[in-house]
From Swiss-Prot:
Binds 1 zinc ion per subunit. The keyword RNA-binding does not apply. It catalyses: 5-methyltetrahydropteroyltri-L-glutamate + L-homocysteine = tetrahydropteroyltri-L-glutamate + L-methionine. GO terms for biological process: methionine biosynthetic process; methylation. InterPro entries: Cbl-indep_Met_Synth_N, Cobalamin-indep_Met_synthase, Met_Synth_C/arc, UROD/MetE-like_sf. Its cofactor is Zn(2+). It comes from Staphylococcus aureus (strain Mu3 / ATCC 700698). Pathway: Amino-acid biosynthesis; L-methionine biosynthesis via de novo pathway; L-methionine from L-homocysteine (MetE route): step 1/1. 5-methyltetrahydropteroyltri-L-glutamate binds at R18, E19, W20, K21, K112, W550, E594. This is 5-methyltetrahydropteroyltriglutamate--homocysteine methyltransferase. Signal peptide: none annotated. HAMAP family: Meth_synth. The active site is at H683. SUPFAM superfamilies: UROD/MetE-like (SSF51726).
Length: 742
């Protein structure tokens, strides 16, 4: 009988209580030394490695741990340093500056990692001299060995790394070939150090364009075969189906496939005989992207099917566990829902249960997990009826008519200015919210504090000269979690944090039941803010697509049904704001693009459903009420027509890190709705210059009608310091005032 082995593709960096984030931000704030930072992160890395060892994994990943982002780590490994940062020592401070920017230079672009809510730092190839320059991967592998951990190194593969890069004059194929000797050098150093195999992540090979990469992929891995290292390589794919017959023809030692998010195709390919049995199959059978406990009995059935077509089988999560929280141990959850959950640590336990059952005929842990899953499934979370048909899915009048009524009502100037919604969440703001949640202060004391903070920032905005104001969202910890706390059908955990980008962590709510609006969510704060000024104050909501994409979704209903349930709830809040006299309502959809399926065959239906849900949430208002939306971090070319179909009166889009590349997407579409392209990067502490903002405006106006153009930062300002925000917005408004005089 074949012995089943277990492995993992990656583990969360954050720590159970965000120790990683706190240490890094303390270092940035100069509250701890570099030595203290290094010690804290070393301790956390050790904890991660030993935890995985506790669950008897046969091989544990190293190289997944990072000080910021594993793609940026790979850039530094190969000396792919942005030209503006070249000439410096390659160390952690350089890494942080590339990721965050500094007073002299803008940060590198930040892009979604495939269709997840993780973001990577885009490698830049302009005038680089690739070489192996900082082999942190080797250092971390040796550290794992010192702990007696059976580890395997993890590195993003050459095809994926280059495809996710930008800049330079070489072709895609030329860049790959440039890197091959460097990958070889790194592989050899790891093998010489004792690596039994090396995990080479090539998720780009599950995308639509993967067939066009097959020639260069074959050339790359043939090169590694000639170098004598290919048999030590395991190509890991995840998030979708792969072209198994092609991958099986490559001269590597093993292949990793996703058997959760592949829509059943990978198993069909296995059963069709497309897998080369001389290789080891690394089967991603435990969902690495969602928090629900596995149907462990179904996983055993899947393993039995795979065993009929493989000689060596390793079971693993479907992807890195980076995308889920660390552990349920610190949560105090209602048993009715808690029994159905599985975070990163619990997923390792599921793998261990299957290993024990299949290798040792030890069913104790398996039987326990099976009974727990069955208890959860026997509950009913489908209790509500919905009347989707009675709610409008289109505005009363076309945009050309609406905008006339809106302009009469709002009386906005040429090139109106606004912000995206949130203002800095100072330590005081966070402390008051924590004290209120933990019942250390009264509701009245907390409400008084919020009103004072709202009033202070309304005055700041008026003094700066912004045209459309916001209340600042000081009552919100997160733009999705806030709504998860207030809508029926959501569960919000205490420590369910996941990394979004850099030190930015989010705590996605868990959708476990039918979603319903039961009371106003944002009306009080917005109405109070509006009472303080004659300028319009935007109501600020998160849209249904983003709430779904940034939550851990239930899997017992189709996505569209859950999305439309959320849309009806947001529609109720939109109407409540309108009834309270709010003239401008923003329904943010920053995650619309990121949820786009990796395979184009699913795009049309996804976008159709997304547009319908947004319109379900926003179309019931009167013509004179102006609907805004916001999107960020996205490559919009594929969805530009869907963005237009949303029929939002104004859309603001993050573009600053892409240096205006997005504007090209408007060349093939006559975009005739209001639009603001972000004119400066809020993810960096750097204050933009008046000239930079003017240049961004001028470039935008080459493609966009001036009468439709708004000027705004590229995203919310929650993570910035107060003085940074004031200074940057002052520069923005002054640049616009000068532009109005032209």
């Amino acid at each position: 009988m074949t012995t089943i082995k277990t492995s993992n593709l990656g583990f969360p960096r954050l720590g159970r209580k965000r120790e990683w984030k706190k240490a890094i931000e303390s270092y940035w704030a100069k509250k701890i030394s570099k030595e203290e930072l290094d010690q804290t992160l070393t301790d956390l890395h050790k904890e991660n490695l030993l935890l995985q060892k506790y669950y008897h994994l046969d091989s544990i990943p190293v190289g997944d741990f990072s000080l910021y982002d594993h793609i940026l780590d790979t850039s530094l490994l190969f000396n792919i340093i942005p030209e503006r940062f070249q000439g410096r020592t390659i160390d952690d401070d350089l890494l942080f500056d590339i990721a965050r920017g500094n007073k002299d230079h803008v940060a590198s672009a930040l892009i979604k990692w495939f269709n997840t809510n993780y973001h990577y730092i885009v490698p830049e190839w302009d005038n680089v001299e690739p070489k192996v320059s900082r082999n942190v991967l080797l250092d971390r592998f040796k550290y794992a060995q010192s702990l007696n951990v059976n580890a395997h190194p993890v590195i993003v593969g050459p095809i994926t790394f280059v495809k996710l890069s930008k800049g330079g004059h070489q072709t895609f194929e030329e860049k790959v070939k440039t890197l091959l000797p460097l990958y070889k050098e790194v592989f050899e150093s790891l093998i010489d150090a004792g690596a039994e195999y090396i995990q080479v992540d090539e998720p780009i090979l599950v995308t639509d364009d993967s067939e066009s990469y097959e020639n260069i992929t074959r050339e790359a891995y043939d090169y590694f075969e000639k170098a004598g290292v290919a048999k030590k390589l395991v190509i890991q794919t995840y998030f979708e189906r792969a072209h198994l017959k092609f991958l099986s023809s490559l001269p590597v030692g093993g292949l990793g496939l996703d058997f959760v998010h592949d829509n059943g195709y990978n198993l069909k390919q296995i059963e069709a005989g497309d897998f080369d049995k001389s290789k080891t199959l690394y089967a991603g059978i435990i969902d690495g992207r969602n928090v629900w406990a596995s149907d462990i009995e179904a996983k055993k059935v899947l393993i039995d099917k795979l065993l009929a077509h493989t000689n060596e089988l390793v079971i693993q999560p479907s992807s890195s566990l980076l995308h889920v929280p660390v552990s349920l141990d610190d949560e105090t959850l209602d048993t009715s829902v808690g029994e159905g959950l599985s975070f990163a640590t619990e997923k390792l336990d599921e793998l261990d249960a299957l290993r024990r059952l299949l290798n040792q005929n030890d069913s104790v842990k398996y039987d326990k997990l099976k009974a727990r899953y069955e208890r959860f499934q026997n509950q009913s979370f489908k209790n509500l009826d919905y009347d989707f048909e009675s709610v409008r899915t289109s505005r009363q009048s076309p945009f050309a008519q609406r905008i006339e009524q809106q302009q009469k009502r709002l009386n906005l100037p040429d090139l109106p200015t606004t912000t995206i919604g949130s203002f800095p969440q100072s330590r005081e703001v966070r402390k008051y919210r924590a004290d209120w949640k933990n019942k250390r202060i009264t509701d009245e004391a907390y409400e008084t504090f919020l009103k004072n903070e709202i009033a202070r920032w309304i005055k700041i905005q008026e003094d700066i000269g912004l045209d459309v104001l916001v209340h600042g969202e000081f009552e919100r910890n997160d733009m999705v979690e806030f709504f998860g706390e207030k809508l029926q059908g959501f569960l919000v955990t205490k420590f369910g944090w996941v990394q979004s980008y850099g030190s930015r962590a989010v705590k996605p709510p868990i959708i476990y039941g039918d979603v319903k609006w039961t009371a106003p969510l944002t009306v009080d704060e917005t109405v109070y803010a509006q009472s303080l000024t004659d300028k319009p104050v935007k109501g600020m909501l998160t849209g249904p697509v983003t709430i779904l994409n940034w939550s851990f979704e239930r899997v017992d209903l189709p996505r569209k049904v859950v999305q439309d349930q959320i849309a009806l709830a947001i529609n109720e809040e939109v109407l409540a704001l309108e009834a309270a006299g709010i003239k401008v309502i923003q329904v943010d959809e920053p995650a619309l693009r990121e949820g786009l399926p990796l395979r184009s065959e699913y795009h049309e239906q996804y976008l159709k459903d997304a547009v319908l849900s947004f319109k379900l949430a926003t179309s019931s208002v009167r013509d004179e009420t102006q609907i805004h939306t916001h999107m960020c971090y996205s490559q919009f070319g594929q969805i530009i027509h869907a963005i237009h179909d949303l029929d939002a009166d104004v859309i603001s889009i993050e573009t600053s890190r892409s240096h205006g590349d997005l504007i090209k997407d408007f060349e093939d579409i006559n975009y005739d709705l209001g639009i603001g392209l972000g004119v400066y990067d809020i993810h960096s502490p750097r204050i933009p210059t008046k000239e930079e903002i003017t240049t961004a405006i001028n470039r935008s106006l080459q493609q966009i009608d001036r009468s439709l153009f708004w000027v705004n930062p590229d995203c919310g300002l929650k993570t910035r310091k107060e003085e940074e925000v004031k200074d940057a917005l002052t520069v923005l408004v002054n640049a616009v005032k000068a532009k109005r005089q032209e």
